[in-house]
Amino acid sequence: MTNVYSLDGILVFGLLFVCTCAYFKKVPRLKTWLLSEKKGVWGVFYKAAVIGTRLHAAVAIACVVMAFYVLFIK
């Protein structure tokens, strides 16, 4: 279990958020519903989706490293 109030918990949450938003960008219905706004509070979802799609290799490597850390080291 990961504590959200620690640094590694925030990193896990951020990676999962970016990966989820990048997945939402690939689903047409979710893209129009959730990622239509580019500013404001709802714009955070759009920005995370853009980060997830443009840096997909780095995000994937970070997810694998974080999974290894959470499962075996922590």
UniProtKB/Swiss-Prot annotation:
Broad class of the protein's primary localization: Golgi
UniProt record, GO biological process: constitutive secretory pathway
Superkingdom, taxonomy of origin: Eukaryota
Keyword hit for RNA-binding: no
Keywords: Golgi apparatus, Membrane, Signal, Transmembrane, Transmembrane helix
Segments in the Cytoplasmic topological domain: 74
Bilayer-crossing regions: 53-73
Localization per record: Golgi apparatus membrane
Membership in a protein family: Belongs to the KISH family.
Protein's recorded name: Protein kish-B
Encoding gene per record: TMEM167B
